[in-house]
């Protein structure tokens, strides 16, 4: 029995959510999506028994909280980190042919899903054990570590089941995307309208309540135009607000920009149409990879601190290149003045790795010209004036796809870096993720609504 078979067998025996017998209506899907979101938000608000703010140690890492949709010191401490990490690893293993699974068959898809679920559980157990040890290492109560670990394992597995419930058709989209978007929107909303600060989750008083306070008290408004305070590094400012609005408009425009390739179909001879390739061909995948890599390094650096100071120091130095500004430095344009060298290193590392991961993702995820050419031929799509030969079509597509892959990776990396430098609300990566996920949900809602209005379309699209 191979590694994949072992994981798949393990996944089959885990508690699971069954698919609905009949396809739920859009209203029902929205209801279950809302229920899943409420359950997740409640878990993100319930503190872990036996863990206090004084012995939790990741309160300064806003980036981790956003990428993993986690909430410090709560039942959602791990967030969707194990699910994301296992998914990325499985995609890489299958895409690079290190594990042979035919994802075009129902059996292959099922095997992949079960293996991914089992690997996520392994990560849940490992990370829960590490957190349980670090959170309770100062206590003499031998039962407390076990209690914390059990809480984390159960809560994290419930989050996994919530994601599974939504993906299997009870809800809309995926739980991973939904929880990430909810976490980011919470941060952005709080940065605008929060009336109190929540130090444990890096949530300051919002910009607008602060603006009202400054006006009524007659204080100098220049202080909230640009945050230069090291005592309140997460305090939002006016420049960050303007940058958030401006970059939101830019990202929405780019997400809706397509490059069109002229094609014909074998079924409709003589009729020409186009196949759209999104300008952001790899979407936000590159910045997710870079952020997850940095967050994981930072996480293990913090966990290693209680085991080996030297190992923790090395990992921390590496992780610092992935995040900016450093701890205690204002999250605003002022950070460029305080630490210009760190800003340059961060920009170089983030942009270069975004390009590297973006180009790798094209081959790993089946977005490469060869795979796309084969799919076009199977669908009966041809390029006018060219023979129906996979190699010829592959050569033509390669001119578009690799250029789009490079520039889209470069652009999303640049957007994330510039957004971070300008102090956008929710961080640069968070804003990029929130908008792309929101656009996906908008298109999904429009699709589902159209199918409900015109039932005949269900037969045409095979639903």
Curated annotation (Swiss-Prot):
One of its GO terms (cellular component) is plasma membrane. Keywords: Cell membrane, Membrane, Protein transport, Translocation, Transmembrane, Transmembrane helix, Transport. One of its GO terms (biological process) is intracellular protein transmembrane transport. The keyword Transmembrane applies. The keyword Cell membrane applies. Residues 1-20, 90-110, 168-174, 259-283, 362-404, 442-463 are cytoplasmic. It is a multi-pass membrane protein. Residues 48-60, 135-142, 194-236, 306-341, 424-426 are extracellular. Component of the Sec protein translocase complex. Heterotrimer consisting of alpha (SecY), beta (SecG) and gamma (SecE) subunits. The heterotrimers can form oligomers, although 1 heterotrimer is thought to be able to translocate proteins. Interacts with the ribosome. May interact with SecDF, and other proteins may be involved. This is Protein translocase subunit SecY. It comes from Sulfolobus acidocaldarius (strain ATCC 33909 / DSM 639 / JCM 8929 / NBRC 15157 / NCIMB 11770).
